[in-house]
A protein has these predicted regions:
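Conserved acetyl-CoA binding element of GNAT-fold acetyltransferases
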Residues: 109-120
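Active-site rim helix/loop that mediates acceptor-substrate recognition in acyltransferases
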Residues: 60-85
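Conserved beta-strand-loop-alpha-helix junction that forms the acyl-donor binding cleft
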Residues: 144-159, 163, 173-176
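Aromatic (phenylalanine/tyrosine) cluster motif
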Residues: 10, 18-19
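Conserved acetyl-CoA-binding loop-helix of GNAT-fold acetyltransferases
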Residues: 118, 124-137
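A short beta-loop-alpha structural element at the N-terminal edge
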Residues: 29-45, 51-55
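Conserved beta-strand in the GNAT
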Residues: 87, 93-102, 112
Length: 191
């Protein structure tokens, strides 16, 4: 079995360009690593992401009508070499984002696929699954995937992705947040 879903076509100006397999064979999907000049764009898209989880996270908006974003945390996506904020474009249109962080859990050497957000218009077409699979299967890094047990949509999505990966997937019991489901995707079997 091999990683499927997206095929790297070329790299141009820091942009990884992927093309999806069916069900949308004519669709161009681009995952582009952003720079600090794109912080406001990511911040704006993050508002939609925060809105979608506000019911089960029980988050309220601030006095300015926006969800809280920790500025120092957001800035790390352009300061820390293991962190990145990536913009998702579909046929040239902004369709979401992918946030990657270096895990800060003690004793765990892994990158974390921290947040994947796709606008509703582009969902249920296999794009999110293809992106997640491609990222988790790329290179030799170990990957951490975490999601809240209460988030039924994320739970269904990640179970589909993780159940079909050609790499070993290990369930982790971590003490930092008991509501989080934790999975480690490794390049090879753990000893």
């Amino acid at each position: 079995m091999q990683c499927i879903g997206l095929h790297t076509a070329f790299v141009n100006n820091g942009a990884l360009r992927f093309f999806t397999e069916s069900p949308m064979p004519e669709t161009t999907v681009e995952l582009i690593q952003t720079g600090p000049e794109d912080a406001e764009l990511i911040r704006n898209l993050y508002q939609y992401y925060a809105y979608e989880s506000s019911d089960w996270e029980q988050e309220d908006v601030e006095a300015d009508g926006r969800f809280y974003i920790h500025d120092e945390h957001l800035a790390r996506y352009w300061q820390d070499p293991q962190w990145s904020a990536n913009l998702l474009l579909i046929d040239g249109y902004i369709a979401g984002f992918l946030l990657i962080e270096g895990s800060e859990l003690p004793g765990l050497d892994a990158l974390e696929l921290a947040d994947l957000f796709i606008l509703k218009r582009y969902r249920r077409k296999g794009i999110g699954r293809a992106i997640a699979s491609q990222v988790l299967c790329s290179g030799t890094a170990n990957w951490l995937v975490r999601f809240y047990d209460q988030d039924e949509v994320a739970q269904a999505f990640w179970r589909t992705v993780l159940d079909n990966l050609p790499r070993p997937v290990h369930t982790l019991e971590l003490d930092d947040d008991p509501q989080l489901m934790n999975y480690l995707i490794t390049h090879a079997a753990l000893h």
